[in-house]
């Protein structure tokens, strides 16, 4: 038998893509459109959040800048420079303060600090001096407490977890532990379901909570979805129908799940099949609308496309969370 007559594998269909979609290929799929270029450089953008005046804030993890965007003019400015290492998320308290999560050295020096929008009136909320958390993200509940994710560990060393901080910021209570690189976190509209992404094991956690917000209901901790591919699920947000939007880091897309954890749609970044704009990190709604923004960058493509925010219309309007109450 000659080589010419052997059965041959060829790159066809999905196998031509730098990031093939296999198990979700039949989902309703849309491709996002450009909304705003933040920088010509490849910046690790994260933490999209809006204040009451509908100004957009976001952070750049490795460089430490906190950006502010006027959504009417789309003017981008630097709100302040983080004094802490590797800021990974920004959330806004009902009183208007910005709460910034930072990863520190990715091992033992992360925390959360609060400031005004100019980076002033600094207050340490979770101190790196007396904890070992590597804090990636957080979500407020209606009482003013919050859940945060501990980003530590890796696939065979599950050191991460999710913790609840009381409204007075004095008590930290573990909710789930022993997971690998806890990343995105969101609460359902009724605050009964806590969603958590576990990046390095490619898992989605759905946690049903008791009324105290920290006790897991009987049989309430489940993993409704296992993701595939490199790298894994990142930050998340919910809409008013309780659908969950999960950014897929390293894959240039966002997957959408219904309130029971079933995938119902996906949003693709332009150029992903050619390996462009793959570092999709965070989805967030423009308040009062169903317009979803998604930040990503082109670092894996030698930063050719810079750092972008893309947009689509989602299934429903975004859920108006704690800062708008």
Curated annotation (Swiss-Prot):
Record's GO cellular component terms: cytoplasm
Keyword Phosphoprotein among UniProt keywords: no
Top EC class, one word: hydrolase
A matching Pfam family: SGL
Keyword flag Oxidoreductase: no
Compartments reported by the entry: Cytoplasm
Annotated binding of Ca(2+) 2, by residue: 108, 110, 128, 131, 133
Principal place of residence: cytoplasm
Enzyme Commission number(s) of this protein: 3.1.1.-
InterPro entries, sorted: 6-blade_b-propeller_TolB-like, SGL, SMP-30/CGR1_Lactonase
Cofactor binding annotation: Binds 2 Ca(2+) ions per subunit.
Active site residues of this protein: 234
Cofactor annotation: Ca(2+)
Binding-site residues for Ca(2+) 1, renumbered to this chain: 46, 136, 183, 234-235
Record key words, sorted: Calcium, Cytoplasm, Hydrolase, Metal-binding
Any one Gene Ontology molecular-function term assigned to this protein's record: metal ion binding
Region forming the signal peptide: none
Record-stated family: Belongs to the SMP-30/CGR1 family.
Biological function: Exhibits lactonase activity. Acts in cells with perturbed membrane integrity and is possibly related to the membrane homeostasis.
Name of protein: Lactonase drp35
Native organism: Staphylococcus haemolyticus (strain JCSC1435)
């Amino acid at each position: 038998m000659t080589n010419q007559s052997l059965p041959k594998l060829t790159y066809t269909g999905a196998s031509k893509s730098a990031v093939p979609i296999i198990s979700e290929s039949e989902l309703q799929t849309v491709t996002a459109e450009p909304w705003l270029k933040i920088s010509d450089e490849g910046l690790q953008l994260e933490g999209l959040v809006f204040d009451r005046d509908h100004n957009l804030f976001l952070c750049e993890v490795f460089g430490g800048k906190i950006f502010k965007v006027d959504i009417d003019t789309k003017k981008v400015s630097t709100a302040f420079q983080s004094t802490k290492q590797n800021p990974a998320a920004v959330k806004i308290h009902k009183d208007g303060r910005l709460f910034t999560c930072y990863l520190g050295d990715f091992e033992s020096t992360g925390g959360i600090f609060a400031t005004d929008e100019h980076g002033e009136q600094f207050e340490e909320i979770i101190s790196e001096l007396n904890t070992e958390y590597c804090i990636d993200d957080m979500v407020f509940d209606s009482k003013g407490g919050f859940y945060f994710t501990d980003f530590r560990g890796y696939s065979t060393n599950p050191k991460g977890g999710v913790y609840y901080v009381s409204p007075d910021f004095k008590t930290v209570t573990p909710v789930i532990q022993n997971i690998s690189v806890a990343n995105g976190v969101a609460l359902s509209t009724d605050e009964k379901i806590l969603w958590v992404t576990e990046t390095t094991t490619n898992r989605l956690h759905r946690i049903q909570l008791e009324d105290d917000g920290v006790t897991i209901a009987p049989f309430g901790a489940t993993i409704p979805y296992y993701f595939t591919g490199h790298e894994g699920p990142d930050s998340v947000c919910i809409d008013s129908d309780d659908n969950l939007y999960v950014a897929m880091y390293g894959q240039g897309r966002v997957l959408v799940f219904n309130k029971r954890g079933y995938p119902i749609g996906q949003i693709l970044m332009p150029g992903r099949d050619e390996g462009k704009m793959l570092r999709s990190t965070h989805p967030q709604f423009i308040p009062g609308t169903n317009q979803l923004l998604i930040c990503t960058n082109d670092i894996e493509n030698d930063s050719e496309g810079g750092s972008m925010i893309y947009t689509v219309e989602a299934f429903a309007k975004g859920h108006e969370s704690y800062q708008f109450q």
